[in-house]
Every structure is written in structure tokens, then in C-alpha cells.
């Protein structure tokens, strides 16, 4: 596996949009008893449903720990690859690599692949005092292992960053939240300008849209963008929304809308906002909380906690949209309709019982990581 000391942008790489063609999707397999209830069995069924849904559109690789490999293999169809990999938890959007591509080799680049991966630093969303669990040593190696398996060049970065904290349009614009990226539990030594500079060098972006805050209740990640707002296509975003002025989310959504309405992207386009209504407020039940082993190794999951449920946390596959369903008949149906209208060339697949994932702090986008298709160089075609 090649490694490089120069920045990805110097080699011609950039992060493509999620709707660009994929080679495959990576997913981790849940097992932490202190985060997933009933020994993670209900969550495993939903993860399997997500993997199966995506596999109808593109190849899927599921990574499972040595103790869970056989169980994962049994629960998943044969066309889904299952590989053994240790992890502290199964949030591959955040512990997995950020894949980057280039259209053609750059003259002075020593790297011969048109795909590479960024291996960011990771501290379990906050480090020793604020993180979601005490030991993330296995998670730190996930990106490196995935890139080694695929023999893809690796760019390592000391900056702490999770994939769920960035969204790009593939045309130079990056969407982020101040709540997460400027949080003192991530990179306290870096200014906003320094963070932008590093993301320009590593993601190949030129401009940023900073939303002040993420989704209300998304305390685990300190307001990841992927639960709040995402690009649907260049110049168009989907924004988590509520009309209920008594819901603390209302203020956040209005604030974000104001920023977006006054923003232009890297190509000079005004941003069009499509509102994607959140479900009616969901809370962890006593029964759900009691099914989780609360042993002090991970943050407690308490009954009555507002769940960070949002339909923006969907995944774009090749020709498919894999979207969470929360058991709210009106909002679930409406989310499918809005996503179908927004992505007319994709089939929208709703995943029932996505609540099992949100009980542990994330959703479908958080558990998936796309590996883009490697662009074929013009030079390789002999033109």
C-alpha cells in the first residue's frame, strides 16, 4: 500500500459527491453490548437489512470482529463479502477512510492509482473526557486496514475528523457545522481558517458553508452535518426541518436555513433548500435502556433521552436511496415521497426499524462508507 507525504490535492485528488458511481460500500458489524441493546441482536438484523438493500444496487463488504465473523456470515447473503476486522464500534462513516479520486494522473505524482483514501485521526467523537467510549484503538486502524485490503494509496492526517462531519458536492463546496468542527474536543489547537486550509488540501474543495449547529439531540457526535443537512445535487441541499416552534430543533433549522439562503457554492450558485421534515420527537424507552449493558466503558443510554432521528441520514447507492423509517406513519411516508421527488432517477428503499440504529446514536449514513469507482485515465485508453 503506497503512502504519500504530499497532500491529496497536490496529486490531483478530490472527494467526489456521494451520488457519483461507487465500486462498493463498506459497513461494520455491531456487537458492543454497552451501546446496542440485547447483545446487538436487533441492531444486527437492521444492519443486515441495510446491507441487503444496498447490495441490490452495488457490491457490499461487511467487516466483523473475529468473535462475530461467523454470525455475520450466517445473517448475510452470499453475494455480500464478509471480512474479519477488529473495531471498537461499527460506525464506518466516521472510522473508515474518506475516499478520493482524480480524473487522470498528475505529471509529478508518484502514485499510479486514480483512487486514494484519507486516514484521518479519530478520538471516538471527543476523546478521553467527551468521547463515546474509553478505548478506540481498534477504530484507529480501520481506515488503514480497508485501504490495505484494496491496495489503495493512503494519505494519513493527524487532524481529528469524522466522515459524518463533512458533506461535499463534488464541485468544490463543503458543508460542515461549527458545533462539531470547532468543538474544543476535536482540534482545539486549530483555528477555523486552519481547518479550512487542511480540508482544501485533502478534499480538494475551495469553499465552505458553515452551519452553526447540527441536529438537536445529536450530542454523541456534537452535531454532525450528515444528520442535519446534505447535498442532493450541486446547488441543492436537503435540510432537517420542523414547523413546531416549541421543538428545540426549530431554532436550529431556521438558523441553518438563514445561512443556506445567503450562501453561494464554489461555482457561484445560490443554494436551493428542500425541507425534509424530522419525525415527531422520539425518546428512548425504559425497556430499550434496560437492554443495554451500562458498565462505564461507554456513555450511558438513558430512558427519556431524545433520539437524534433524521431522514437526512440516508445513503446514496448506485441508482438507489437507502432511507431510515422510524415508525412514524405520516413522516416516514412523506420522507420517501420527498426523497423520490429529489432523486427521480433513484429507487428509494425505506429501512423499517431504523430506530434500532438511532438508539445507539446514528443512522444509515453513519454506518456506511462509499468507495467510489476508480476513474479510468484518458491516457490509459490510448487517446
From Swiss-Prot:
pH dependence: Optimum pH is 7.0.
A GO molecular-function descriptor: protein-arginine deiminase activity
EC number: 3.5.3.12
Protein's GO biological process: polyamine biosynthetic process; putrescine biosynthetic process from arginine
Active site: 366
Alphabetical list of Pfam families matching this protein: PAD_porph
Activity regulation as described: Inhibited by N-ethylmaleimide and iodoacetamide.
Residues noted as binding agmatine in the record, renumbered to the chain: 220, 226
Documented effect of changing residue 366 to A: Impairs enzyme activity but does not abolish it
Catalytic reactions on record: agmatine + H2O = N-carbamoylputrescine + NH4(+)
Keyword flag Hydrolase: yes
Pathway(s) where this gene product acts: Amine and polyamine biosynthesis; putrescine biosynthesis via agmatine pathway; N-carbamoylputrescine from agmatine: step 1/1
InterPro entries registered for this protein in UniProt: Agmatine_deiminase, Peptidyl-Arg-deiminase_porph
Entry keyword set: Hydrolase, Polyamine biosynthesis
Signal peptide as annotated in the record: none
EC category name: hydrolase
Function: Mediates the hydrolysis of agmatine into N-carbamoylputrescine in the arginine decarboxylase (ADC) pathway of putrescine biosynthesis, a basic polyamine.
PANTHER family per UniProt: AGMATINE DEIMINASE, AGMATINE DEIMINASE-RELATED
UniProt subunit comment: Forms homodimers.
HAMAP family assigned: Agmatine_deimin (MF_01841)
Family: Belongs to the agmatine deiminase family.
Protein name listed in UniProt: Agmatine deiminase
Taxon lineage: Eukaryota, Viridiplantae, Streptophyta, Embryophyta, Tracheophyta
Gene: AIH
